[in-house]
Amino acid sequence: MKLYKIYSRAIGLLFALSLLCVGCENEDILDINDLEISPSNPESVVIVEPDDGITSVNALTKAINENGDATYILRRDGVYYMEGKNVFKHNVVIKAENGSGKMPIIQPICDAQGALNADMIRLEGSATFENIYIIGKDAATGNLMQRLFRIDESNVRLKFDNCFIDHCRNFCIRTDNVNNKIYLNNSTIRNLALTSDPANGRLIDSRGNEQDSIVINNCYVYNNTAHIVRFDNVVTNYFGIKHSTFYNVGHHIQINYAIKVEIENNIFANVGWKSSAESDVFWQISIPKKDERAQDISTLDSQLKFMIK
C-alpha cells in the first residue's frame, strides 16, 4: 500500500514537471526592443473635450494637471487652444480618438491683450503625440510661434507618430537639458521659417546640450530656412535619418560629435541653398577626438563621405 502511494506520487510529480516544461517551451522572451516608455499609470484614459477659444482655452493642459500620467484622447474635428504658458509636468500620451474626421488640432491663441507666449508647450515629462495636427500659428492674429516644443528637463522622451506639424519661426523642438530622446515617425513637418533671419527655422535645436537619441524616420520635411538638426558642438549618442524626404531646406546637414549615425534611403532635394562660409557644403561632420565613446567614429565619417560623393 505504501509502495502504491509512493509510485502514484512519483507519477504525479513527473506529470506536473512535464506540464511545466511544455508551458515554458513556447514562451516569448522580451528583449530591449520590446520595451517602451509609457505613462506610469497607462490604464488611465482621459477624454478631453475641445476648446472654443472664447469661453474655454487650455483644456488639454488643465486635464493633464488634474489627472497626471495618462493617455489623453482628443476629439476629431476639435481644436485645443494653448494660451499663455503651458507646461506638461507628467508623462503623457496624447492621441486622436478612433474613427473618421479630421485630426485634432493643437494651436496657440493670444490672450486678451494680443500677447503670444514664446513657447507653445514646455515639457518636464515624456510625451507621445499620435495622429495630431500641430500648428504654430496664432488662431486670432495669424502670428507665428517662436518655438513649438521646449524640453525643460533631462531624460525626457518626446515622440511624434503620424502627426502633421506646421509653422513656427525659430525651431520646432528645443532642448534645454541633457540625455533626451526625440523621435519623429511617419510625420510631415513643414514651414519652419523666418525669412528675415534664415538662421532660424530649425527642426531640432539641442542648444549645446548632449542628447541620447535623435531619430527621423519615414517623414516628409520641407520649407525650412535653417538646419534640420543643430547639435551645437556636443555629443549625441545616436542620430538616425531613415526613409525620409527633405525638400527646400536652407542649411547644410550638420552632424556634430554623434557616436553612432545611420543615414539610410533618404531623398535630399534643394537642401543647403543658403550661403555658407565654405563653398559647396552639403554635410558638415565633426569627430569627437577626445571622447572615449567615439571608437569607430573615423570609420563612420569615411563611410558617410563616401556615400555622399
Regions found by a protein language model. Give the residues of each.
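Bacterial Sec-dependent N-terminal signal peptides
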Residues: 3, 17-47
